[in-house]
Amino acid sequence: MTEQKRPLTYRDAGVDIDAGNELVKRIAPVAKRTRRPEVLGGLGGFGALCELPTKYKNPVLVAGTDGVGTKLRLAIDHNRHEKVGVDLVAMCVNDLIVGGAEPLFFLDYYATGKLDVEIATSVVTGIGEGCELAGCALIGGETAEMPGMYEGEDYDLAGFCVGVVEKDGVLDGSKVEAGDKLIGLGASGPHSNGYSLIRRIMAQAETDIDLDGKPLIEHLLEPTRIYVKSLLKLIEQVPVHAMAHITGGGLPENLPRVLPDNTRAVIDTKSWEFPAVFQWLQQEGQVPAFEMYRTFNCGVGMVIAVPASHVDDALALLEAEGESAFLIGEIQAGDGQPDVVLDGLSA
């Protein structure tokens, strides 16, 4: 006689709808704090609605998507979930601002093997914090509980952001010319790039140490700096020719993305302090100098090209807005494809 099969539920399969509903309740106040006047409706609809701000006469929408990469593994292993949401927002909105765009709204995707409401609430609270720092609205998202796809409570994040810019205010690098000065903005740490190498180095080094009076793990999990509000003010007052978000690939890979042909960026790598966390990574991993700059931001999270006649005004404004800003190089005439020259590197 065959054993009678019992009825199965979605929860038996590993998906807890009630937990998902509880999460929505908890994050509703987070989304409310980020609300902009253009947003129509609240959370829970099939689609989120947002008007264009009326101040734009000829608006262009700018969209971007990104994740946090394997920095998540470090956060999960150390039970530090409260700031990875800031990282997620930062990686998206910093990409938008380099085109001159004001971020309007943000959506997130949270995927996990088993939904832990406390962890997810902590992550989304960080996303809300990032949206507040960037001035954009958290208007929706997706929480996917996928048993068999992720191990236990491990999770992955993705973000999507839309911004707006006047058509004649789009920054695409076409105005960059020889003689422009390059300003670097200080990074808060490795931001959200290079963590596969970081974790490899950590596996072979002593990590229970302090750097500059702060535990190493605090340096490594410091959230990515969001530059949006200070750069929006800069764009209003200074003729910015281009901006580059220094992410994976570092200065050598990201600066050429905003340079026209027949130009090159010459960077003085001694013009800013090489942060202690990168000194530690280079020493413990025996990482060659160029590989460091091709993997990490090495202390510079954003680069801005401005006419030489406006560099002092730009530096003063950025410092007044709370940024660590420094002159790091200039644009010179080149030959063919845009290039980056890193002066002052040691082997």
Swiss-Prot record:
Molecular function terms from GO: ATP binding; phosphoribosylamine-glycine ligase activity; phosphoribosylformylglycinamidine cyclo-ligase activity
Enzyme Commission code(s) on record: 6.3.3.1
Source organism, top-level taxon: Bacteria
Alphabetical list of InterPro entries matching this protein: PurM-like_C_dom (IPR010918), PurM-like_C_sf (IPR036676), PurM-like_N (IPR016188), PurM-like_N_sf (IPR036921), PurM_cligase (IPR004733)
A single Gene Ontology CC term: cytosol
Subcellular location, record wording: Cytoplasm
Pfam families according to UniProt: AIRS, AIRS_C
Matches recorded under SUPFAM superfamilies: PurM C-terminal domain-like, PurM N-terminal domain-like
UniProt keyword terms in alphabetical order: ATP-binding, Cytoplasm, Ligase, Nucleotide-binding, Purine biosynthesis
Pathway(s) served: Purine metabolism; IMP biosynthesis via de novo pathway; 5-amino-1-(5-phospho-D-ribosyl)imidazole from N(2)-formyl-N(1)-(5-phospho-D-ribosyl)glycinamide: step 2/2
Catalyses which reaction(s): 2-formamido-N(1)-(5-O-phospho-beta-D-ribosyl)acetamidine + ATP = 5-amino-1-(5-phospho-beta-D-ribosyl)imidazole + ADP + phosphate + H(+)
Coiled-coil ranges from the UniProt annotation: none
Protein name: Phosphoribosylformylglycinamidine cyclo-ligase
Protein species of origin: Alcanivorax borkumensis (strain ATCC 700651 / DSM 11573 / NCIMB 13689 / SK2)
Top-level taxonomy: Bacteria, Pseudomonadati, Pseudomonadota, Gammaproteobacteria, Oceanospirillales
